[in-house]
Amino acid sequence: GISFKHFQAWDRRSKFIAAGIYTHAKSLSAKRFLAEFLQKVPFKVLSIQVDGGSEFRAEFEQACADLAIPLIVLPPSKPTYNGGVERGNRIFREEFYARSDFLANSIGAMRAHLTKAINKYNTYRPHYALKGLTPMQYIQNHILKVAA
């Protein structure tokens, strides 16, 4: 098998999720994920909350500063403060990584499968917390209409 690191971003309001697979959990990987995330997210990012891992230092901190996005670093050993991301991690473990047919022998193949899973999550999978809407439906109905 291959070794990879999973990066994930989750919007507390709309439940919109983005994720990426990288070969290392380094600050440069986190910076790259941030750039990819900002290209995908259909609304303005007002702040970013991270768990304080070393991958969210150096290049990542500088990228947030350069973009004028406030960075909120959670205290150590407080996963309850990051409940939405922890829930997202569980969803990916149960609905994506646990399925053997999604596992691949290359990072590129894993990324392709992950992109499909994220699209399904954001576009087709209804969410109880959103009263049966998908994240994209919620964004269109409640975020983009307000901004227009």
Regions found by a protein language model. Give the residues of each.
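C-terminal domain-tail junction helix/linker
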Residues: 58, 67, 78, 91-148
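RNase H-like polynucleotidyl transferase catalytic core
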Residues: 47-52, 66-84, 100-106
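Short, acidic, Ser/Thr-enriched surface-loop or helix-capping motifs
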Residues: 11-12
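Acidic/histidine-rich, metal-coordinating catalytic segments
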Residues: 25, 43-57, 75-77, 133-136
